[in-house]
């Protein structure tokens, strides 16, 4: 199956909207968190770490951390964020405690309606086995199995690290980090400096309750010219979308066009052999050659 590069996938649009409606753990804009978009980001060429700062303040003005950490899927997700070496080329060492944390997270998300619906869909498509335990083993492999991102190096990366945590290429170029919780926590620790928003072409600026945004920021001095992220959604929602797109195709790069709420998106998933290389939502009306 070739990756879909243009037409809207109506089957996945319907499914993903049902998953959106089922995402009871999603945090509510203006109530559970507040963002401040501020200025529009400037152009930054690829591999440049110089960016005009169009935002004097952090993106996240407020997050109800008590509520966030009271939700089991968020709490177990947050426990995974400090388990990785940032640089590719530096071998990852996975401790028994970290394996247990990975399993606790998968157990938590597999109890949600979102992941049960995703599992049911994949079983119907013969892309997952009916047993929840078999599905958990499959998810562990897709997301947490280590592989070498730098040629000739020891295993130094995995899908989860790239997408949800972020990593760097020789400390000079940042990669991944498409998750709002990690963005918030790194911003709170002063590791992330938000530079401004990248607007959709048909919209002069995003709204502060938008739940898909294109952002420019620096992370430990490395600039991300444009990084896209869902905002407020639960970890299980993102896991479900990216896993479904990954399993739907053997293509190296899958780009499924979907309509989700008010957004027209490409869900982009890059395959690293049998594992996820990267995954993110791309707002389709943003034509920027230096994305991601």
Curated annotation (Swiss-Prot):
Protein's gene: endou-b
Record's subunit section: Monomer.
Keyword Nucleotide-binding: no
TM helices/strands, residue ranges: none
Names of required cofactors: Mn(2+)
InterPro entries the UniProt entry points to: ENDOU, EndoU-like, EndoU_C
Active site positions, chain numbering: 162, 178, 224
Family: Belongs to the ENDOU family.
Ranges of residues in domain EndoU: 8-285
Coiled-coil ranges from the UniProt annotation: none
Protein name: Poly(U)-specific endoribonuclease-B
Chief site of localization: nucleus
Source taxonomy: Eukaryota, Metazoa, Chordata, Craniata, Vertebrata
Function: Poly(U)-specific endoribonuclease involved in the processing of intron-encoded box C/D snoRNAs, such as U16 and U86. Releases products that have 2',3'-cyclic phosphate termini at the 3'-end.
